[in-house]
């Protein structure tokens, strides 16, 4: 799957889950599971409930996503 196939959406973290997984509520109201991307993990970027994040989704499974950016 190429980088053009992903869907980027904005959302808000509503809950921390084990193994660097988070429950994210998107702008359109959908709730999904998001995990931290490798670069964010490598640079020790902390994500807390209430943070605004950018999530990448695949067209195949819209219930899971990758958190790629945390807004300040």
Swiss-Prot record:
CDD domains: S1_IF1 (cd04451). It is found in: Cytoplasm. One of its GO terms (molecular function) is ribosome binding. GO terms for cellular component: cytosol. Its main location: cytoplasm. It comes from the Bacteria. This is Translation initiation factor IF-1 1. It comes from Thiobacillus denitrificans (strain ATCC 25259 / T1).
